[in-house]
């Protein structure tokens, strides 16, 4: 590797990974509830293990949804439909342990501090306080069209294409569990120049050889996802490096909601506030705040105000307005942090109800985000991925 160059690695997982099964179940339940009761409060956690699904959490709603059916339908859609996989949609046990949201939390979310103290006149927006304290990060970079870091973008692309090859039966020996990882080499200007390493671990039928798997992935997977200009004779490939991946899914590892937060975001390329997304309604700023921060960051880069930017938002429970906003452009902007913050404050309403309204979050859009990442999804129409405020933001800041 040339002097002053460096490597960066990100990973993704398939929809059949145990933690992602849990995320998808939690978000499928959220979607089912919010489609009937947009104002429902949902904090739904899922655990999966061999032959068992446990759904727990706090849900406050006036509607009924058939949680066991949602669980089984989600597992079936993912592809766990045979008992010999060690996890089967029809035969697994489904246990539920659901309570209502704590009234101590609810009073701060139902009526924000600003509303309770009479300090704000914008009653409709100020009425909702943040569902918890916490910090969230949003990020964007111009190194891909989707304004995402290249390592996580390619890792997701490999995981998504691998799942497609399985579900369309193009490679009918594949089973649902899989992981991908991509190492990108950056030059001294921090621009991606080549792929150093690709790792794919995919569950498979016991009778297929590793040589056959490797040949098929080089034929049907890598050319469909990776720009060949990034590949060279020194690019390393590790395909099922243990030599066998037959036991997978919840039979191989227990899965939990919220345990793939780096996969869900930027692959470690940007910082993370620690809060998970799946199973949470949009009053939870862990989710809506992170979506808003990505929306802000993406519009800053799309406006040409920076080449790379990280936005931090922070909230106090029961308080509507963010307690802080931070913007770091890594020296890629001609404008000061305060100029950017002033423009963002003028154009983006970052109070919880403002975010919910701005991004139209009280609708069933979450299940589709629970695998292959919440950001940079050109295959989905996600409101926080739009750049519809870029021109207005540019006009506010560029004098």
From Swiss-Prot:
GO cellular component, one term: cytoplasm
Residues that hold K(+) according to the record: 45
Binding positions for ATP per the UniProt entry: 17, 177-179, 244-245, 253, 259-260, 276, 280
A Pfam family that the UniProt record links to this protein: S-AdoMet_synt_N
Record PROSITE patterns: ADOMET_SYNTHASE_1, ADOMET_SYNTHASE_2
Cofactor(s) the record lists: Mg(2+); K(+)
Subcellular location: Cytoplasm
Keyword Nucleotide-binding in record: yes
Pathway: Amino-acid biosynthesis; S-adenosyl-L-methionine biosynthesis; S-adenosyl-L-methionine from L-methionine: step 1/1
EC number: 2.5.1.6
A single MF term (Gene Ontology): ATP binding
Catalysis performed (reactions): L-methionine + ATP + H2O = S-adenosyl-L-methionine + phosphate + diphosphate
InterPro entries for the chain: ADOMET_SYNTHASE_CS, S-AdoMet_synt_C, S-AdoMet_synt_central, S-AdoMet_synt_N, S-AdoMet_synthetase, S-AdoMet_synthetase_sfam
Cofactor info, note text: Binds 2 divalent ions per subunit.
Residues the entry annotates as binding L-methionine: 58, 101, 253, 284
Residues holding Mg(2+): 19
Function of the molecule: Catalyzes the formation of S-adenosylmethionine (AdoMet) from methionine and ATP. The overall synthetic reaction is composed of two sequential steps, AdoMet formation and the subsequent tripolyphosphate hydrolysis which occurs prior to release of AdoMet from the enzyme.
Protein name in UniProt: S-adenosylmethionine synthase
Native source species: Listeria welshimeri serovar 6b (strain ATCC 35897 / DSM 20650 / CCUG 15529 / CIP 8149 / NCTC 11857 / SLCC 5334 / V8)
Upper taxonomic lineage: Bacteria, Bacillati, Bacillota, Bacilli, Bacillales
């Amino acid at each position: 590797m040339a002097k002053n160059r460096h490597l960066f690695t990100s990973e993704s997982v398939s929809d059949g990974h145990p933690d992602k099964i849990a995320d998808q179940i939690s978000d499928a339940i959220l979607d089912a509830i919010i489609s009937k009761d947009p104002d429902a409060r949902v904090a739904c956690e899922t655990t999966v293990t061999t032959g068992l699904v446990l759904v727990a959490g706090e849900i406050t709603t006036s509607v009924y949804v058939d949680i066991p059916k949602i669980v089984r339908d989600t597992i079936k859609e993912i592809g766990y439909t045979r008992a010999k996989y060690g996890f089967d949609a029809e035969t697994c046990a489904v246990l539920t342990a659901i309570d209502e949201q704590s009234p101590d939390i609810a009073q701060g979310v139902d009526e924000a501090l600003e509303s309770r103290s009479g300090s704000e006149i914008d009653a409709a927006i100020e009425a909702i306080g943040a569902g918890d304290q916490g910090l969230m990060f949003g990020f964007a970079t111009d190194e891909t069209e989707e304004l995402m870091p290249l390592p996580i973008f390619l890792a997701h692309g490999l995981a998504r294409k691998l799942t497609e090859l399985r579900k369309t039966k193009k490679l009918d020996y594949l089973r649902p569990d899989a992981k991908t990882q991509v190492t990108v080499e950056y030059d001294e200007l921090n621009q991606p120049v080549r792929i150093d390493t690709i790792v794919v671990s995919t569950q498979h039928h016991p009778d297929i050889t590793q040589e056959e798997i490797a040949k098929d992935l080089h034929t049907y997977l890598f050319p469909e996802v990776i720009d060949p200009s990034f590949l060279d004779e020194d690019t390393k490939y590790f395909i099922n490096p243990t030599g066998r991946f037959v036991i997978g899914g919840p039979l191989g590892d227990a899965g939990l909601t919220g345990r793939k937060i780096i996969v869900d975001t930027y692959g470690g390329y940007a910082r993370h506030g620690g809060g998970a997304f799946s199973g949470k309604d949009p009053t939870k700023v862990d989710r809506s705040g992170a979506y808003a921060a990505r929306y802000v960051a993406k519009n800053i880069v799309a406006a040409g105000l920076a080449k790379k930017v990280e936005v931090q938002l922070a909230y106090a429970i029961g308080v509507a307005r963010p307690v802080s906003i931070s913007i770091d452009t890594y020296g890629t902007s001609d404008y000061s942090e305060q100029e950017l913050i002033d423009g963002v404050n003028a154009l983006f309403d970052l109070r919880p109800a403002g975010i919910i309204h701005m991004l139209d979050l009280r609708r069933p859009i979450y299940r589709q985000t629970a695998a292959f990442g919440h950001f940079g999804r050109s295959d989905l129409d996600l409101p926080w991925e739009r750049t519809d405020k870029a021109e207005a933001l540019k006009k506010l800041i560029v004098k």
